[in-house]
Amino acid sequence: MQVTVTNADGLKRELKVQVPSQELEAKLGAKLDEMKNQVRLKGFRPGKVPVSHLRKTFGKQVMGDVIQETVGESSQQALQDESLRPAFQPSIDLEGEIQDVLDGKADLTFKMSFEVIPAFELSDFSKVSLERLTAEVKDEDIDVALKRLAENQKNFEPREEGAKAETGDLLTIDFVGKIDGEAFEGGSAEDANLEIGSGRFIPGFEEQLVGVKVGDETQVKVAFPADYGAEHLAGKDAVFDVKVKEVKAPAEVKLDDELAKRFGLESMEKLREALGEQMKGEYARMSRMHLKRAMLDKLDELHSFELPPTMVEQEFQQIWQQFEHELSHQNKTAADLDEPEEDVRAEYRKIAERRVRLGLLLAEVGEKNNITVTEQELNQALAERARQFPGQEQQLYRYFQQNPQAIQELRAPIFEDKVVDFIAELAKVEDKVVSRDELFADPDADEHEHHHHDHDHDHDHDHDHDHGHDHDHGDEKPKKKPAAKKAAAKSDDGEAKPAAKKAPAKKKKED
């Protein structure tokens, strides 16, 4: 086999690989010999079919298999011989007349085109300084959590006859929504439950029901926001005919042992302990998130190297498609943004470059330090995922068994976390005690006002390139995506009430 490098421009590589016809012929002969004892042909005893007859009958078909196998084997050998690490599976283009190769009259010649993983030096992580935010779980924090827990457990009791509804009360209502006097699709419901002040219905709806009594029939006038999710309702005035069937007031929930028993605990003391431990776990996760974010920022700052264009383009397309998909839920396109689409694309391309750079960095750290994901870790992650789908565990396991990409997406965040932990062990990490609010604050909050389009890329994205780089760098910035819609209000039977739901909220501007 002869390998010639025909292009080495930047990270782009082209190799010309030539395999002598004699080598193909030898492989063909070996395969035909194997077939001799397996093929059953009329007129010949088992194992007595002449190779010449097999060549005449099956020669081209078998030679096709030989060529396919040889291309795969020789392309991998060429990469090893040249010490090249492709970013993606190389594209293969056969050269010359394939018929001549099949007939054994010409060598097998093909061209390999690909981009290589860049070579770069990793920083000395022992010289990297990072700050880790920490906060103490205080008694008053547990008190707040207890009150919130009690609030979620509250029951409602009917108000006295003739009593007026107040904010926080639970109403049972029938309503019919109309625009220009005509009822519209999805604008009606019977026996709908509405907690005044919950914000589940469009702005202005709930406030107008303060003061109503059982038996009242009233009209609620609202204006659907211009950016409302349902295009046929956006920007229009509507009137809802509302009949009040029941008014209930929230009953006081006492912070006592009885409340604890609702959660399977014997006393309020045990409930406080359980809440405290749960909150410590939440604080630790937030602390780690801030550390990881700071680490990724520092890694991005310390390393600069050429990136494979195809990897960046693929990452950009993934980000942009997600962005357009989320815009479509608001009946918008990129043309509706306050910024020129070209500027938004440029900003997202920088995000794509950052993601690819960090992915290559983390993969390099993992490879050089033999960091791997064990079967036990993978099985544990799979079990945790299965617990999210009670009753469907077997289907989930089958899905992962049959989909290697799904397993890869499960492995990626585990690999990344192990690499992050490895770097954190080497780096100079200084703890900084902050308040709970500071710990849970959005790290991008100060920058939100400087952007004029509502978009926020989820930081969690699992993807794996053909070179085996597992990464999802879950806390990288900037975070951008279209504002998510508010969930539809639900009636007791779970049926959505689109007309009465709150419109998509304008999200704070992000990064």
UniProtKB/Swiss-Prot annotation:
SUPFAM superfamilies from the UniProt entry: FKBP-like, Triger factor/SurA peptide-binding domain-like, Trigger factor ribosome-binding domain
GO cellular component: cytoplasm
Endpoints of the signal sequence: none
Primary localisation category: cytoplasm
Family: Belongs to the FKBP-type PPIase family. Tig subfamily.
Official protein name in the record: Trigger factor
EC number(s) from the headed UniProt entry: 5.2.1.8
Cross-referenced Gene3D superfamilies: 3.10.50.40, Trigger factor ribosome-binding domain (3.30.70.1050), Trigger factor, C-terminal domain (1.10.3120.10)
One of the GO BP terms on file: 'de novo' cotranslational protein folding
UniProt catalytic activity: [protein]-peptidylproline (omega=180) = [protein]-peptidylproline (omega=0)
Compartments where located: Cytoplasm
GO terms for MF: peptidyl-prolyl cis-trans isomerase activity; protein folding chaperone; ribosome binding
Domain commentary: Consists of 3 domains; the N-terminus binds the ribosome, the middle domain has PPIase activity, while the C-terminus has intrinsic chaperone activity on its own.
Primary gene name: tig
Keywords from the named record: Cell cycle, Cell division, Chaperone, Cytoplasm, Isomerase, Rotamase
Residues annotated as domain PPIase FKBP-type: 168-253
Renumbered residue ranges of the record's region Disordered: 446-511
Function according to Swiss-Prot or TrEMBL: Involved in protein export. Acts as a chaperone by maintaining the newly synthesized protein in an open conformation. Functions as a peptidyl-prolyl cis-trans isomerase.
Biased composition (Basic and acidic residues): 455-478, 489-498
Start-end of Basic residues biased regions: 479-488, 499-511
Pfam families to which the protein is assigned, alphabetical: FKBP_C (PF00254), Trigger_C (PF05698), Trigger_N (PF05697)
InterPro entries in alphabetical order: PPIase_dom_sf (IPR046357), PPIase_FKBP_dom (IPR001179), Trig_fac (IPR005215), Trigger_fac_C (IPR008880), Trigger_fac_C_sf (IPR037041), Trigger_fac_ribosome-bd_bac (IPR008881), Trigger_fac_ribosome-bd_sf (IPR036611), Trigger_fact/SurA_dom_sf (IPR027304)
Taxonomic source organism: Parvibaculum lavamentivorans (strain DS-1 / DSM 13023 / NCIMB 13966)
Highest classification ranks of the organism: Bacteria, Pseudomonadati, Pseudomonadota, Alphaproteobacteria, Hyphomicrobiales
